[in-house]
């Protein structure tokens, strides 16, 4: 993938520059969300499957419940933090 030079971007009209910036910001936001999901899933998987050998391609009921609970707690916490920051 080639990168755009500063000169190439500056030669665009204002509307095109704005559209490119919005696209880049959108892609960065998507990347952050995907990274967070990956980190939460990894952390919760390690928490819920600590010291257990992987014996199947599927989760048992206890593992599934633990993962759901772990992820929901993180989501709830993040929502509360965002709400608190927005309230300031």
Swiss-Prot record:
Topology of this chain in the membrane: Peripheral membrane protein
Subunit structure: Heterohexamer; composed of 3 copies of TIM8 and 3 copies of TIM13, named soluble 70 kDa complex. Associates with the TIM22 complex, whose core is composed of TIM22 and TIM54. Interacts with the transmembrane regions of multi-pass transmembrane proteins in transit.
Organism whose genome encodes this protein: Candida albicans (strain SC5314 / ATCC MYA-2876)
Function text: Mitochondrial intermembrane chaperone that participates in the import and insertion of some multi-pass transmembrane proteins into the mitochondrial inner membrane. Also required for the transfer of beta-barrel precursors from the TOM complex to the sorting and assembly machinery (SAM complex) of the outer membrane. Acts as a chaperone-like protein that protects the hydrophobic precursors from aggregation and guide them through the mitochondrial intermembrane space.
A GO biological process held by the record: protein insertion into mitochondrial inner membrane
Record motif Twin CX3C motif, residues: 44-70
Domain notes: The twin CX3C motif contains 4 conserved Cys residues that form 2 disulfide bonds in the mitochondrial intermembrane space. However, during the transit of TIM8 from cytoplasm into mitochondrion, the Cys residues probably coordinate zinc, thereby preventing folding and allowing its transfer across mitochondrial outer membrane.
Family: Belongs to the small Tim family.
Listed name of the protein: Mitochondrial import inner membrane translocase subunit TIM8
């Amino acid at each position: 993938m080639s990168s755009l030079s500063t000169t190439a971007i500056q030669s665009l009209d204002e509307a095109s520059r704005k559209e490119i910036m919005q696209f880049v910001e959108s892609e960065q936001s998507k990347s952050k969300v995907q990274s967070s999901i990956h980190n939460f899933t990894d952390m919760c998987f390690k928490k819920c499957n600590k010291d257990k050998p992987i014996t199947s391609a599927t989760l048992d009921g206890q593992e599934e419940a633990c993962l759901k609970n772990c992820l929901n707690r993180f989501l709830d916490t993040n929502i509360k933090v965002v709400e608190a920051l927005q309230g300031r």
